[in-house]
Amino acid sequence: MTVDVTYQPQRVDGLTRMGLVTLTNKSDHTCKVEGRAAISLVNAADEVVDVPIEEADEPGAAIPITLKPGRSAFEGIKWTLCDKSDADCGVGNSLRFNLEASTDGPYARLDGFPAPEKSAITMKSMTIGTLQPSTQGVVAW
């Protein structure tokens, strides 16, 4: 599996930001996914940053999805920006994903995010939606 997280500039609302998570089956075999892909903020020292996570049934309840090779499933993430100098602000330069645990998976490819050397991804909290078979409504909550 690979994951791409695409920043959604049209979904900016105050300090709230959104990303479209695209989970793609890169194997030669059909697989099933259900629920959500855990997303973690990671810093330049390759450490998972502690960010409060909330799970939301958005845009609806999770359903089993069968992914043939090359096919994708989608989920939305929403996070609240914070000031790097705040003690409760998570600061990182990349994101990881995991389908089996809540942290420490492979790196996601980021599109539209700050350059990694800037360590400019800030998160006070993050909400993760459910995996869906299409992009419809995935970042509309």
Predicted region positions:
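Low-complexity, acidic Ser/Thr/Pro/Gly-rich terminal tails and inter-domain linkers that flank the onset
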Residues: 1-13, 137
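Extracellular/mature segments of secreted proteins
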Residues: 3-7, 39-41, 89, 97
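Short, solvent-exposed loop/turn segments enriched in Ser/Thr/Gly
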Residues: 14-20, 90
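Asparagine-centered strand-capping/turn motif at beta-strand->loop junctions
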Residues: 21-28
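Short beta-strands and strand-coil junctions in structured, solvent-facing domains, enriched
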Residues: 28-30, 82-85
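Short acidic, flexible loop segments centered on an aromatic residue
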Residues: 33-48
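Intrinsically disordered, low-complexity Pro/Gly/Ser/Thr-rich segments with frequent PxxP/GP/PP motifs
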Residues: 52-82
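Extracellularly exposed regions in secreted/surface proteins, prominently low-complexity, repeat-rich
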Residues: 72-74, 81, 87-141
